[in-house]
Regions:
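Short, small-residue-biased leader/transition segments that mark boundaries at the very start
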Residues: 2-7
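Short beta->alpha connector loops
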Residues: 8-9, 29-32, 192
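Short amphipathic alpha-helix with an adjacent loop that forms part of the alpha/beta core around
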Residues: 11-20, 39
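Short active-site oxyanion
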Residues: 20-24, 151
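Donor/substrate-binding cores of folate-linked one-carbon enzymes
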Residues: 23-142
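Active-site-lining helix/loop region of Rossmann-like oxidoreductase modules
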Residues: 120-178
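An anion-binding loop in the catalytic cleft
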Residues: 155-235
Length: 236
């Protein structure tokens, strides 16, 4: 109640300064912290970013790690500066990505590991046991927000790319392909172990629903036809 009254009287900047914090921790905030707040706290302002910085700077690092078929990502705790995920690195905890893991599943994994890592790192920051390390700018990549339009794929693409797209776009916006002018969302897939000697888009099998791609084939385990409900690929 008292904090609410303070918010009414003061700007957020003034409130934070009045609290004289020991440290400011930012997680999945989505905005750049104003420069005037970066050095307000005794131990500075830190950010927990879910990638192996400088790889995947931006708002969708989890999704892009899956979309690109990476087998590993991580939790990076860094000092905030005026840039976008460009501050000095304090601590890195690698996180494995399973072959069929979706972005949603990876989010759950890195959230749990990130929380545990943050609790372990805060005392080390207070004790001065961590040495900030500059990011290697030549290795920097971006992870921009996803859009619905980006979710489309077609079977002229490699099977591995399509599988990664299905995983990476789940739970949002969900990968899809066009069939008879309608969107068919694919919520789960796996790579087929059988070779495909057919044109991309050809149905190789119905049980399980297997489609030929540019190279190899993909099994569509779960689909959602436009205007319909989610169903097994074999039922479509």
């Amino acid at each position: 109640r008292g904090l609410g009254d303070v918010y009414k009287r003061q700007s957020s900047d003034e409130l934070i300064k009045s609290l004289a914090p020991d440290i400011i921790v930012v997680v999945a905030y989505g905005c750049i912290i104003p420069p005037q707040l970066l050095h307000v706290a005794k131990y500075g302002c830190i950010n927990l970013h879910v990638s192996l910085l400088p790889k995947y700077r931006g708002s969708a690092p989890i999704q892009w790690a899956v979309l690109n078929g990476d087998t590993e990502t991580g939790v990076t705790i860094m000092q905030l500066d005026e840039g976008l995920d460009t501050g000095d690195i304090l601590y890195v905890q690698p996180v494995a990505i399973d072959p069929d893991m979706t972005s949603g599943e990876l989010f759950d994994r890195v959230s749990a590991i990130g929380a545990k890592t943050l609790v372990e790192v805060l005392p080390k920051i207070e004790a001065g046991k961590l040495t900030p390390k500059k990011q290697e700018e030549s290795l920097a990549t971006k992870a921009p927000s996803l859009t619905k339009e980006m979710a489309q794929f077609d079977f002229t693409q490699p099977a591995a790319h399509i599988h990664n797209w299905v995983r990476g776009m789940n739970p949002w916006p969900m990968a899809f392909f066009m069939h008879d002018g309608k969107k068919i969302k694919v919520t789960a897939s796996k790579l087929s172990e059988n070779p495909a000697n057919a044109a991309p888009g050809s149905v190789l099998a119905v049980k399980p629903l297997t489609i030929a791609c540019q190279d190899g084939a993909i099994v569509l385990d779960s689909v959602t036809p436009e205007g319909g409900k989610s169903m097994a690929g074999t039922a479509w």
